């Protein structure tokens, strides 16, 4: 395994040899095959949803500068998308605002980001602060919660050629479609911000769904293949209990750099801290 790991960067170089970066239009055309490959062969593509979204909302926050709602959208008959939508007050009729879709880390809830009564040491209510600044914000629930419960879902999906992100991608697609229908939303300015495990979403989902206008990966961007498979690297997932990380032949096709190439030419940003524990400083 370690010998294959050392050769992976050269396999990726051969794999990407048909991408042409001579200009933006050529790049877009020649990387479509890689976006399709990532979705079909690495993440695993679920059929497009056929059910109506049937949006349901419930008022949960009344703040001085914004109002908050719990939102539920149907994706499949037994799969739904859930999150908290914060809408700034004072939006004039006909005015449209940009949106930030936000994602927390492992074992989190949207309330960890949006509830002003919770001051999580990693998040510090940043979703509420964005709403106070005038952004529409959607903090969504991801299925990586429940310790081994969600990891069992991953292992059940893998023999079918699927992964947890197969469902996450379709949930995001449904959320983007619904957000674009809201009269106060500027649908071509929906951005994504993910932190920690949420940044695994920031790498994969905007690479596949071009409706996101930009992506920010916070506290996760890495030499991802080594981090997953190295037997010697002190930050390797081989030394943790997060055994669900591995993806289909990822090392020979996509590292985090290559995923970010699929976001290009849309803006992409990396945030990291000197002491965030992601990689050696």
Model-identified regions with their sequence ranges:
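Alpha/beta-hydrolase fold nucleophile elbow
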Residues: 184-196
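Active-site glycine-rich loops that stabilize anionic/oxyanionic intermediates
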Residues: 76-77, 104-109, 196
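Cap/lid segment of the alpha/beta-hydrolase catalytic domain
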Residues: 92-181, 226-231
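Short beta-strand/loop motif that positions the catalytic acidic residue
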Residues: 263, 270-272
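Mobile cap/lid helix-loop segments that gate and shape the active-site cleft of serine hydrolases
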Residues: 167, 214-259, 274-281
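Glycine-rich nucleophile elbow surrounding the catalytic serine of serine-hydrolase chemistry
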Residues: 194-206
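Non-catalytic accessory segments flanking enzyme active sites
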Residues: 7-87
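Conserved hydrolase catalytic core segment
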Residues: 207-213
């Amino acid at each position: 395994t370690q010998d294959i790991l050392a050769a992976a960067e050269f396999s990726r170089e051969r794999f990407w040899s048909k991408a042409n970066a001579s200009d933006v239009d050529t790049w877009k055309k020649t990387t479509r095959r890689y976006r399709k490959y990532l979705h079909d062969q690495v993440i695993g593509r679920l059929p497009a949803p056929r059910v109506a979204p049937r949006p349901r909302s419930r008022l949960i926050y009344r703040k001085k500068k914004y109002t908050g709602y719990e939102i539920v959208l149907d994706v499949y008959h037994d799969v739904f998308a859930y999150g908290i939508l914060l809408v700034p007050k004072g939006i004039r009729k006909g005015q449209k605002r940009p949106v930030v879709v936000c994602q927390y880390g492992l074992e989190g809830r949207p309330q960890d980001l949006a509830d002003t009564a919770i001051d999580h040491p990693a998040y510090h209510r940043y979703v509420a602060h964005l709403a106070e600044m005038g952004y529409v914000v959607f903090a969504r629930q991801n299925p990586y919660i429940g310790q081994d419960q969600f990891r069992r879902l991953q292992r059940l999906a893998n023999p079918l050629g699927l992964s947890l992100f197969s469902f996450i991608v379709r949930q995001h697609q449904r959320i983007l479609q619904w957000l674009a229908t809201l009269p106060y939303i500027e649908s071509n300015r929906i951005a994504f911000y993910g932190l920690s495990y949420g940044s695994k979403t920031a790498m994969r989902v905007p690479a596949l769904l071009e409706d996101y206008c930009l992506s920010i990966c916070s506290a996760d961007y890495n030499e991802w293949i080594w981090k997953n498979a190295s037997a010697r690297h002190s930050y390797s997932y081989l030394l943790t209990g997060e055994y669900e990380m591995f993806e289909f032949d990822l090392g020979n096709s996509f590292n985090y750099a290559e995923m970010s190439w699929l976001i290009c030419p849309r803006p992409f940003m990396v945030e990291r801290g000197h002491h965030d524990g992601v990689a050696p400083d």
